[in-house]
């Protein structure tokens, strides 16, 4: 399973990559914003997107909406990762088609729980 981790903060990308590795997911690529991510998604196959909310150029929410609007990408599970625990953000993400939502900071166990819920809902594999 190939993941794309999208975050403008390189340390956060490394943290998420490390947590995914801890969970057995070794095929992880990175993008620093939504524009780069969308270009990568359109040019190479990915199975799962983990995206930050607040980024320059194209926010995570804008990326999510672009993914859902593209017939070739609309099936991709998207887990939104953010420091924003505001109810309205969670509702907005859900309305826009987010597969899940996790608030920073989080542990490998929390990430595992969120991923497994999404895998169960989408019928995707739970192993790398």
PLM segments and residue spans:
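Helix N-cap/capping motif at the beta->alpha junctions
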Residues: 30-39, 60
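Receiver (REC) domain active-site loop signature in two-component systems and cognate sites
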Residues: 55
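Alpha4 helix (beta4-alpha4-beta5 surface) of REC/receiver domains from two-component response regulators
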Residues: 17-18, 62, 85-100
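Two-component/phosphorelay signaling modules centered on CheY-like receiver
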Residues: 10-29
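Active-site beta3 strand of CheY-like receiver
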Residues: 44-50
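Short amphipathic alpha-helix used as the core "switch/output" element in two-component signaling
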Residues: 39, 61-74
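C-terminal output helix
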Residues: 106-115
């Amino acid at each position: 399973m190939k993941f794309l981790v999208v975050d403008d903060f390189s340390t956060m990308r490394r943290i998420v990559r490390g947590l995914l590795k801890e969970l057995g997911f070794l095929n992880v690529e990175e993008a620093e914003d939504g524009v780069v991510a969308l270009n990568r998604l359109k040019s190479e196959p990915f199975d799962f997107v983990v995206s930050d909310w607040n980024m320059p150029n194209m926010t995570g929410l804008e990326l999510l909406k672009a993914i859902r609007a593209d017939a070739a990408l609309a099936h991709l599970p998207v887990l939104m990762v953010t420091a924003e625990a505001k109810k309205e953000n969670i509702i907005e993400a859900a309305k826009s088609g987010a597969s899940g939502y996790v608030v920073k900071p989080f542990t490998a166990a929390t990430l595992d729980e969120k991923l497994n819920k999404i895998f169960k809902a989408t019928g995707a594999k739970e192993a790398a």
